[in-house]
């Protein structure tokens, strides 16, 4: 089994039944400037404080993985502006997570929605400069064309630049984005300081995910109460979920937070009886067994079971062996780490080697014990969260699939006997759509 990497496969794009899309635009042609204006885009902002209050009440959480409240970020950078500091906005569209496609899709198909979100964020924090940070060539071209269409005056005098970078897992980390814009390497920096303290050119900087910013125009146009009409109390609004695996073409869905996981399966055409588990949050949040069938898609539910929604990427495991999937993901972390923190460089290599040996039936009980120990002691020891992601994958494999681990120790995994899952970039998906 060569794996289920799905690069180049046609992407299904749809909203959940009964959901009026806020982020997706169907059919999925590239939205023009005139079409966006006709829908009320680039509306004048009368009162900054009023919109800030609405963002606070909306409870809009970051869609990049950490689910940090956008209102808190905005107010922190705005406070620096009010103290007389120059401020900057960065729209982070470097979607380094191979199993996620949402940000690239928005940048390619709805660049004006993203730019409108950047415009509003800049007004809220008092910024005159902003950057759209991307690694996808098609996304960069779409944004560049949109900037030519929209004009300087519509943006309120905001100077927006596009910064491109080679794709990479760590390149999307917020301090890596700032380093690239400042002329440095696409590698995370030690924290503190964080970008809101000392970012682009040393100025307080709001770094926010593309999908997060794309929600701002909806809040501005319709208010917090309407935004909260979808989702849960703690996880309000809709969000974009990239679904891969299960032997089916990849898909990008817009769903409300709180929807049952089984509803997502039905939308994707997968029977719960087929499901062995899921790889959650792209590669970061680790593996879940069939307990995932009892979940709802919101941050509070997944935190309670030791997992996470992360960037909203869900890989459904049906025929793939979770041990082999974990080994592939850990090998990816080993290749993709920045190579600048010894604990991460050595830790990801050690975990990848142990998981690879387990997949191949060559591991010992001592290897598994070491993998278990590393998944605990290595957390929080890198400049970014790459090592934490690797630890999550290792820990969740051992916790959720102990019987499979034992089968691999005994060299008798029936799934791997038919061919080992060995994708270099497991569940990778492109933003293409026919």
Language-model regions: role of each:
Residues 139-257, 268-272:
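Hydrophobic alpha-helical positions that pack around
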Residues 102-113, 204, 208, 253-256, ...:
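Short alpha-helix boundary/capping segments
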Residues 115-121, 256-272:
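Short amphipathic, charge-patterned alpha-helical segments
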Residues 1-185:
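Iron-sulfur-cluster electron-transfer modules
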Residues 124-130, 246-249, 336-337:
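Short, surface-exposed connector motifs at secondary-structure boundaries
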Residues 66, 71-74, 100-103, 141-146, ...:
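Short acidic, glycine/serine/threonine-rich loops at helix termini
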Residues 41-57, 85-87, 93, 103-107, ...:
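Ferredoxin-type iron-sulfur electron-transfer modules in oxidoreductases and energy-metabolism complexes
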Residues 137, 245-246, 270-296:
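Short acidic beta-strand-loop surface patches of small beta-rich interaction domains
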């Amino acid at each position: 089994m060569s794996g289920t990497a799905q690069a180049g496969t046609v992407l299904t794009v749809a909203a959940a039944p009964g959901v009026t899309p806020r982020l997706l635009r169907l059919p999925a042609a590239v939205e023009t400037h005139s079409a966006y204006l006709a829908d009320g885009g680039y509306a004048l902002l009368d009162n900054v404080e009023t919109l800030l209050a609405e963002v606070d009440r909306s409870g809009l959480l970051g869609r990049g993985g950490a689910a940090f409240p956008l209102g808190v970020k905005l107010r922190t950078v705005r406070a620096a502006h009010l103290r007389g500091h120059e401020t900057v906005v960065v729209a982070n569209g470097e979607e380094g997570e191979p199993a996620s496609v949402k940000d690239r899709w928005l940048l390619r198909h709805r660049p004006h929605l993203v730019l409108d979100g950047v415009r509003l964020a800049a007004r809220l924090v008092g910024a005159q400069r902003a950057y759209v940070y991307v690694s996808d060539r098609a996304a960069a071209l779409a944004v560049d064309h949109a900037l030519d269409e929209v004009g300087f005056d519509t943006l309120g005098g905001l100077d927006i630049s596009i910064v491109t970078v080679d794709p990479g897992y760590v390149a999307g980390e917020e301090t890596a984005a700032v380093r690239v814009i400042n002329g440095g390497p696409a590698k995370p920096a030690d924290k503190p300081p964080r970008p809101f303290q000392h970012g682009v050119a040393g100025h307080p900087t709001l770094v926010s995910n593309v999908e997060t910013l794309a929600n701002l125009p909806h809040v501005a146009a319709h208010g917090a109460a309407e935004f909260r009409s979808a989702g849960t109390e703690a996880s309000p609004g809709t969000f974009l979920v990239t679904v891969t695996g299960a032997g089916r073409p990849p898909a990008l869905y817009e769903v409300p937070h709180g929807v049952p996981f089984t509803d997502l399966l039905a939308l994707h055409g997968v029977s719960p009886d087929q499901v062995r588990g899921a790889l959650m949050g792209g590669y970061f949040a680790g593996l879940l067994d069939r307990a995932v069938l009892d979940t709802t898609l919101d941050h509070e539910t997944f935190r309670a079971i030791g997992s996470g929604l992360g960037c909203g990427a869900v890989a459904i495991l049906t025929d793939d062996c979770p041990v082999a999937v974990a080994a592939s993901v850990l090998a990816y972390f080993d290749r993709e780490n920045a190579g600048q923190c010894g604990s991460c460089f050595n830790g990801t290599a050690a975990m990848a080697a142990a998981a690879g040996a387990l997949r191949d039936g060559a591991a010992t009980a001592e290897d598994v014990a070491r993998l278990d120990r590393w998944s605990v002691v290595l957390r929080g020891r890198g400049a970014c969260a790459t090592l934490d992601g690797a630890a999550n994958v290792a820990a969740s494999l051992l916790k959720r699939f102990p019987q499979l681990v034992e089968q691999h120790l005994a060299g008798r995994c029936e799934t791997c006997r038919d061919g080992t899952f060995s994708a270099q970039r497991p569940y990778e998906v492109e933003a293409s759509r026919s």
